[in-house]
């Protein structure tokens, strides 16, 4: 039984019912419907912290989904899981793939910036100031782009960028 059919969360159930109705009435291929079902089940598993199950669903969705925009969100969610698991290098790969298909994905830009900022802090702790400087600059570049796309978001990043200008 698909995960979406055994969910006990009211909001998830509501989303599932609405999604099922849309899948039935929208003029999409069976392949697209199946891809969306895997994606939806992946989101549900991810929300419950079942990352291995979520990844399986996302990988199945990737095999079926052909639309670049939709693929970008699948790739982004895979990146989120790798970030949560501390696999930052792997997460970056998926965020970059998502951006290649959807350059206007500010959340991927933000997450890339967060990883570079984290790595810069690690370099600073190891007294690798030149490496840290490069990584902080990369973080700033990605945050600036994310903020350009969504000026009212990423307030902490905006604050950090302003402080950085004043140093």
UniProtKB/Swiss-Prot annotation:
Keywords: Chloroplast, Membrane, Photosynthesis, Plastid, Repeat, Thylakoid, TPR repeat. The keyword Transcription does not apply. The keyword Thylakoid applies. It comes from the Eukaryota. It is a peripheral membrane protein. SMART domains: TPR. Essential for the assembly of the photosystem I (PSI) complex. May act as a chaperone-like factor to guide the assembly of the PSI subunits. One of its GO terms (cellular component) is chloroplast thylakoid membrane. This is Photosystem I assembly protein Ycf3. Belongs to the Ycf3 family. Pfam families: TPR_1. It is found in: Plastid, Chloroplast thylakoid membrane. The lineage of its organism: Eukaryota, Viridiplantae, Chlorophyta, Ulvophyceae, OUU clade. NCBIfam families: PRK02603.1. GO terms for biological process: photosynthesis. TPR repeats lie at residues 35-68, 72-105, 120-153. HAMAP family: Ycf3. It comes from Tupiella akineta (Green alga).
């Amino acid at each position: 039984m698909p995960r979406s059919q055994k969910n006990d969360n009211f909001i998830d159930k509501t989303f599932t019912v609405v999604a099922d109705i849309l899948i039935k009435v929208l003029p999409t291929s069976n392949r697209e419907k199946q891809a969306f079902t895997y994606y939806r089940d992946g989101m549900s598993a991810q929300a419950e912290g079942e990352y291995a199950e979520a990844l399986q669903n996302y990988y199945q969705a990737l095999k079926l989904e052909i639309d670049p925009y939709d693929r970008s969100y699948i790739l982004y969610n895979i990146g989120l899981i790798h970030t949560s698991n501390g696999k930052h290098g792997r997460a970056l790969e998926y965020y970059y793939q998502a951006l290649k298909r959807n350059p206007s994905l500010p959340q991927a830009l933000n997450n890339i910036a967060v990883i570079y900022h984290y790595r810069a802090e690690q370099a600073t702790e190891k007294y690798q100031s030149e490496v840290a400087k490069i990584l902080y600059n990369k973080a700033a570049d990605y945050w600036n782009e994310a903020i350009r796309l969504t000026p009212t978001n990423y307030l902490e990043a905006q604050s950090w960028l302003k402080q950085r200008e004043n140093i």
